[in-house]
A protein has these predicted regions:
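Conserved nucleotide-sensing/catalytic segment adjacent to the nucleotide-binding pocket
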Residues: 28-83
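Hydrophobic positions on the alpha1 helix immediately C-terminal to the Walker A/P-loop
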Residues: 17
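NTP-dependent small-molecule kinase module
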Residues: 24, 114-145
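Conserved lysine of the Walker
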Residues: 14
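Hydrophobic anchor at the beta1->P-loop junction of P-loop NTPases
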Residues: 6
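The conserved Walker
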Residues: 10
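A glycine- and Lys/Arg-enriched "phosphate-lid" helix/loop adjacent to the NTP-binding pocket
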Residues: 83-119, 136
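Walker A (P-loop) ATP-phosphate-binding motif of ABC ATPase nucleotide-binding domains
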Residues: 3
Length: 145
């Protein structure tokens, strides 16, 4: 595991898992939200992403569908946090300030995005693919590393 992509609903713990894996595996964690950072243009974001993808190793969390093909083609591991809506809402409750704008997205995530996420798994045939369905499974996975 040297190039890891983590996807899933808001509140599922993508960033938390990325940080934990980064510490355990001593790999750099690249947040797509961090690459976007404020008012970057699309071209600036794309340039930052290309530089990040060219690194020897990384962990990237975030969905950003427009960039998924580039990330999937270069990853060796894809982790899908396939949590139910209540687990994701619980994750949102940990954030300050509370992201009210994410509640509707979380509530409808599975219906709107599950098929897309399954397609990402299918596209990543070359990679190790993990589907973790609960925080307990995430903890158990981290304990195996």
């Amino acid at each position: 595991m040297k190039r890891i992509v983590i996807i899933g609903c808001s509140g599922s713990g993508k960033t938390t898992l990325a940080q934990a894996l980064g510490e355990k595996l001593e790999l750099p964690v690249i947040s797509l939200d961090g690459l976007w950072c404020g008012n970057a243009t699309k071209a600036e974001f794309d340039s930052r992403l290309e530089r990040a993808l060219s690194l020897e190793s990384w962990i990237m969390d975030g969905n950003y569908g427009r960039t998924m093909d580039a990330r999937l083609s270069r990853c060796d591991t894809l982790i899908y946090l396939d949590f139910g809506r209540f687990a994701c809402l619980q994750g949102l409750l940990q954030r300050r300030p509370f992201p009210w704008h994410r509640v509707k997205e979380v509530w409808h995530y599975r219906r709107k995005n599950h098929t897309r996420d399954e397609l990402y798994l299918a596209k990543a045939q070359h990679a190790q693919r993990l589907v973790l369905k609960s925080r307990k499974e995430v903890r158990e996975f981290l304990n195996t590393i």
